[in-house]
């Protein structure tokens, strides 16, 4: 009886040719696993293609709701970003995929897990660190680090040689990652920084200049930091993301052209479409500015950056990530209320906030006197606050 390998399978170029390659070079029984995080593929086609390519079995795991509730809601509450711009669409999906791969490997008593990540990317780290955190014994096969195929063009040639159908041509080659949260585009002519990215690559977003000529007003209601209602309508978590992707996309919201510092040491360029995430972060940020006290608000920004880096670097299964989640959850206890946004041709303008937990007080913040604040108190405060500067000036050095 042949030993088994569980393959993270998408039906794309890399994983399509890995099936025959594993059988040819390792003589393994290949079990394909497609983790459905909302990439929008025809799963019946993916199943058929995996079997035709030589897999003995194919699992399709629909984890969209788990992805939103256990991963993306953490992103929203923390407002995690990598290097201030990247909304971590790929990074948040990988630990969930790694979790499912390990579960099925245990179920099938597989000795190996295989992935199609390149030897230059971050995903190889995310997958393998995620797998090892759950099963330190299972062995990893990473074809891109060991086979003779050195480019995507080589991969296409190999696919033709072994008779695997691949929906990519040499004329237009982008590496695309899609899920509920985002679409990323890398490779091809994007690797030359002198090239402006082409708007015809977009899947989710209408180019801003071609978006609607009338503004769209949008209301998002949050409960303890998590979105619950869109325009007054209660929706399930997956439908919330889908609806906001549609609304944001048709208004040209959510395009980012980013140069990022990869974990493995090089810089890379990616074009990202994240309409729902962009809307949710903007609304959540506005609500937090009203409901969090100054020091919690400021410290959370530091923690959010650290959280983004942890997730980007594949360190999901760590005590620090769990501790940050606990801190973030504490900060979200009063982040409840409705934020109205005005959307127009790629721009987002927060219009209003309605929350019973507002720390903003119109009476205190106005220019008039109030019982809690007297203009006369400011003089003593300024004297004490400026005392270090005054002493330094008196010392004259």
Curated annotation (Swiss-Prot):
It comes from the Bacteria. Pathway: Amino-acid biosynthesis; L-arginine biosynthesis; L-arginine from L-ornithine and carbamoyl phosphate: step 2/3. CDD domains: ASS. ATP binds at residues 8-16, 116. Keywords: Amino-acid biosynthesis, Arginine biosynthesis, ATP-binding, Cytoplasm, Ligase, Nucleotide-binding. Transmembrane segments: none annotated. One of its GO terms (cellular component) is cytoplasm. Belongs to the argininosuccinate synthase family. Type 1 subfamily. PANTHER family: ARGININOSUCCINATE SYNTHASE (PTHR11587:SF2). This is Argininosuccinate synthase. It comes from Clostridium botulinum (strain Kyoto / Type A2).
């Amino acid at each position: 009886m042949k030993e088994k390998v569980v393959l993270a399978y998408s039906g794309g170029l890399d994983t399509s040719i890995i099936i025959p390659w594993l059988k040819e070079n390792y003589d393994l029984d290949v079990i394909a696993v497609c983790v459905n995080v909302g990439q929008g593929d025809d799963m019946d086609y993916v199943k058929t293609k995996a079997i035709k390519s030589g897999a003995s079995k194919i699992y399709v795991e629909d984890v969209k709701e788990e992805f939103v509730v256990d991963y993306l809601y953490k992103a929203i509450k923390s407002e995690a970003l990598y290097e201030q711009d990247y909304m971590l669409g790929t990074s948040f999906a990988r630990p969930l995929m790694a979790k499912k791969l390990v579960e099925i490997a245990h179920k099938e008593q597989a000795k190996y897990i295989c992935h199609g990540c390149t030897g230059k990317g971050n995903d190889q780290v995310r997958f393998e660190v995620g797998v090892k955190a759950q099963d330190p014994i299972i062995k990893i096969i990473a074809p891109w680090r060991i086979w003779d195929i050195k480019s995507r063009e080589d991969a296409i040639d190999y696919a033709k040689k072994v008779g695997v159908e691949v929906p990519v041509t040499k004329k237009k080659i982008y590496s695309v990652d899609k899920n509920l949260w985002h679409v990323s585009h890398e490779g091809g002519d994007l690797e030359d920084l002198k090239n402006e990215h082409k708007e015809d690559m977009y899947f989710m977003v209408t180019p801003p200049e071609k978006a609607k000529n009338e503004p769209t007003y949008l209301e998002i209601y949050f409960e303890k930091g998590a979105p619950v209602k869109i325009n007054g309508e209660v929706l399930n978590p997956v439908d919330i993301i889908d609806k906001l992707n549609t609304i944001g996309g048709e208004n040209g919201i959510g395009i980012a052209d980013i140069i990022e510092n990869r974990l493995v040491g090089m810089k890379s360029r990616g074009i990202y479409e994240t309409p729902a995430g962009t809307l949710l972060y903007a609304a959540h940020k506005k609500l937090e500015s009203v409901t969090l006290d100054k020091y919690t608000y400021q410290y959370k920004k530091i923690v959010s950056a650290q959280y983004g880096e942890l997730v980007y670097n594949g360190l999901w299964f760590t005590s620090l990530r769990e501790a940050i989640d606990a801190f973030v959850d504490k900060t979200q206890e009063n982040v409840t209320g409705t934020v109205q946004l005005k959307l127009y041709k790629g721009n987002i303008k927060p219009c209003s906030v309605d929350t019973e937990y507002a720390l903003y007080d119109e009476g205190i913040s106005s220019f008039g006197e109030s019982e809690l604040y007297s203009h006369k108190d400011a003089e003593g405060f300024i004297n004490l606050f400026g005392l270090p500067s005054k002493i330094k000036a008196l010392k004259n050095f």
